[in-house]
């Protein structure tokens, strides 16, 4: 189900290339890039030209299918061996978002029973496209489930960009706002700018304005004052990886928002698809946290804002403990109780709230 949608797609398959919206150029320029090699795909993910856990997974899946076309062998076993090398290479691009390895693993499984190299290559393309199609419906369902938590006129805060351009369509944390717009529910979102790479100001503010959704931009340090003065009703964020107990890795600054929400007695929600859960990881302490280039902190958009040699600590993500999370919204329902128990039920196919 797709409605008229003003926000462009972040990733598209073109048979001989992958077209991505270059998110590094936003909001000043809407530029599309063609990725034709596995190196192009790796670079696009590492340099944040494409970002957002689901979009990274989709891009990597397309990248594996694309690179597989260049594997020259008639031996299926040899084909799978070379495919595994490419998979490991792409999987090393970013360590925190579990959707990346989930999508690549799913493509690997799609060739297990292939009896020829041609069949394997075809299976890879079909599976990658299917991941994107499923993600759009998943995001719509997340939005639909999240919408029941809000009422007309609510003011809701978010951080980073868990929107349409971070997924195949709609987004996770931003999905309810697109659906609310269709139903004229008048939700208003306060977007934290999200230092150091400014995904909130460059991406979330841009895409919500493209979609005609009411948005107000604030700096990260304004969050507490805004919660108090603007009577924020709730906080909703996306996720890059969710542990077995509900601990959640998301963009740096998310943990701080959760602490503030708890202090103001404001519900704090996480919105994520099942593909973001890592049931092999017991708790947040076991999730690897990517550290990025110090220059991201020393400058903004190429303009130096700090001494060139000042030491920098630049983790891209933080971990929000499960006990600060009021609910985890998925395509299968909303979890609000014992996360470890409910996550286990979810993966057994049982219904949650």
From Swiss-Prot:
Pathway the protein contributes to: Amino-acid biosynthesis; L-methionine biosynthesis via salvage pathway; L-methionine from S-methyl-5-thio-alpha-D-ribose 1-phosphate: step 1/6
Site positions per UniProt: Transition state stabilizer: 160
Reactions catalysed, as given in the entry: 5-(methylsulfanyl)-alpha-D-ribose 1-phosphate = 5-(methylsulfanyl)-D-ribulose 1-phosphate
UniProt-annotated catalytic positions: 240 (proton donor)
Protein keywords: Amino-acid biosynthesis, Isomerase, Methionine biosynthesis
Family affiliation: Belongs to the eIF-2B alpha/beta/delta subunits family. MtnA subfamily.
Its biological purpose: Catalyzes the interconversion of methylthioribose-1-phosphate (MTR-1-P) into methylthioribulose-1-phosphate (MTRu-1-P).
Record-given protein name: Methylthioribose-1-phosphate isomerase
Lineage: Bacteria, Bacillati, Bacillota, Bacilli, Bacillales
């Amino acid at each position: 189900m797709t409605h008229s949608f003003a926000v462009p797609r972040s990733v598209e398959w073109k048979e001989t290339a992958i077209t991505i919206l270059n998110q590094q150029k936003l909001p000043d320029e809407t530029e599309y890039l063609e990725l034709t090699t596995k190196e192009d795909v790796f670079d696009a993910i590492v340099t944040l030209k494409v970002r957002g856990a689901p979009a990274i997974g989709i891009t990597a899946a397309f990248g594996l299918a694309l690179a597989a076309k260049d594997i020259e062998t008639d031996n299926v076993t040899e084909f799978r061996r070379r495919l595994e090398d490419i998979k490991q290479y792409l999987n090393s691009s970013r360590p925190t978002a579990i959707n990346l390895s989930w999508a690549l693993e799913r493509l690997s499984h799609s060739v297990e029973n292939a009896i020829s190299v041609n069949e394997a290559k075809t299976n890879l393309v079909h599976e990658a496209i299917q991941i994107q199609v499923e993600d759009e419906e998943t995001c719509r369902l997340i939005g639909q489930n999240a919408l029941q938590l809000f009422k007309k006129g609510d003011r809701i805060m978010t951080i980073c960009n868990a929107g349409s351009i971070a997924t195949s369509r709609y987004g996770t944390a931003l999905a309810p706002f697109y659906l609310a717009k269709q139903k004229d529910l008048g939700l208003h979102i306060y977007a934290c700018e999200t230092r150091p790479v400014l995904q909130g100001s460059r991406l979330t503010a841009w895409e919500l304005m493209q979609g005609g959704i009411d948005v107000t931009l604030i700096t990260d340090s304004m969050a507490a004052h805004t919660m108090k003065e603007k009577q924020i009703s709730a906080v909703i964020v996306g996720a890059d990886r969710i542990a077995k107990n509900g601990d959640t890795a998301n963009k740096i600054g998310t943990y701080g928002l959760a602490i503030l929400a708890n202090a103001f007695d404001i519900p704090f929600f996480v919105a994520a698809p099942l593909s973001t859960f890592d049931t092999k990881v017991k708790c947040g302490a076991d999730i690897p946290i990517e550290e990025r280039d110090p220059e991201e902190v020393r400058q903004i958009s190429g303009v130096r804002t700090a001494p060139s040699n000042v030491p920098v600590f630049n983790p891209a993500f933080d971990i929000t403990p499960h006990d600060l999370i009021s609910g985890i919204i998925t395509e299968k329902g909303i979890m609000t109780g014992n996360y470890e128990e409910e996550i286990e039920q979810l993966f057994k196919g049982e219904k949650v709230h």
